[in-house]
Amino acid sequence: MNYGLTHTPSLTMSECLVLGVFSDLALPDFATAIDNEQKGLIKKLCQRVPEPGNTVWQTDVEGHSLLIIQCGKKEEFSANSLQKRVGEITEALIKQRFSSATVCLPRLNQESAEWQLEQMIVQIDNLRYQLLDFKTKHAKSHKLESVIFHLPGATEKSLEMAKAIVTGVEFCRDLANMPANICTPTYLGEQAISLSKQFDQISCQVMGPEEIKEMGMGALLAVAQGSDQPPRLIDIHYHGNKNSTPVILVGKGITFDSGGLSIKPANAMDEMKYDMSGAASVLGVIKACALLKLPINLIGIIASAENLISGSAVKSGDIVTTMSGQTVEIINTDAEGRLVLADALTYAERYNPDFVIDIATLTGAIIVALGNIATGYMTRDEQLAKSIERAANESQDKVWRMPLDEAYQDALESPLADMINAGFDRSAGSITAACFLSRFTEKYRWAHLDIAGTAWISGKKRNATGRPVPLLIQLLRHVANSR
């Protein structure tokens, strides 16, 4: 996809010129010039779009097309309005099968041109993204391949930053959408190694069952033992500032989750290929950071396995010893994500991080609580909470803080081991899952992102979203600016 900037938009620059207009202001100078050339055509078309979101097309204007979209009154043109207009424009361009467009939308009052450009590119790229296509007997879908923006105040630097972000998001989506027979733990490790070959600032180590066993990662091995696919622990570093204290992202990499012996319902089990979306987001963020050349030290740790059923699969009631030395009674084999994360979070201690954020499609309970709008997050660190909230607001990648009170820890008590891996009932499922993880994070500042509701869209049009890559990149940009 090509994105660019222009100071002098014209009808002939692309297949379609998109012009956003205010109901209470005159046309901008460049639009007035085009209107004069076309003998008042634009002003006539504007009379046919009285309400915000109204659109009107004019085809075959010097062999090109013109789309007018009403943006309402200037003072009422908000970030939310921008999001709606960009969505309507993108869907219209794709429906009309345009390959290129020049988009001229008014500036927001409250935000910088750099922020507005970034949001427009992220949204357009999100809507034009197409699933990996394994079909053999039909023509490939039409693609919108080039969008040029006219946005006074936007710079080439902000354009390149936006392009880096969408590249990271796309990489995350491609990995998450990959079928589980291709995207195995081994494949995830290969993708991490590939990043280290693409960028000099990235190094990577991928560890297999022997190394995992030597480190005492009994929880990760327990989850993996029911599958013929060997587990992987991926340790990937972005060296943007080797002298700074590292930030660590820990990703859940369950490349397929049948639930194990606590088997999931058949309905929508195919979507359990998305249970590695946390891992995909970690790799997407690291790729974007390398493109952005952020001056930070970032480490990604991914615990990857398949959770399947076999004669050797872990059983309900089994007790395992984690890397931390704590023992866990596994009462539910479908609560496997927290098991692999427990060992990965303990592994993170060796780097003495500034803070750690784990990203995981962890619980169905968070979907019941928040749906697919906001990612649920938990932390006991108020400074980290403020940083996450700020990054979420700026990136428009929404979050909602859930409680992490000590009282919830009682739900994890076991008569046989240090803890059970899931509560005996369904109450507060997302919170007790985070409480479980908190027992492995006492040596550093930590936050948990439960992306089970936001990592993908379910149903016939199932598709990975790439979240929370925009949120995490924005957070890391603030970290970079503070050092």
Swiss-Prot record:
The source's superkingdom equals Bacteria
Q: Which GO terms describe its cellular component?
A: cytoplasm
Q: Where does it primarily localize?
A: cytoplasm
Enzyme Commission code: 3.4.11.1, 3.4.11.10
Cofactors (names): Mn(2+)
Q: What does this protein do?
A: Presumably involved in the processing and regular turnover of intracellular proteins. Catalyzes the removal of unsubstituted N-terminal amino acids from various peptides.
Assigned protein family: Belongs to the peptidase M17 family.
- Protein name (record): Probable cytosol aminopeptidase
- What taxonomic lineage is listed for the species of origin? Bacteria, Pseudomonadati, Pseudomonadota, Gammaproteobacteria, Legionellales
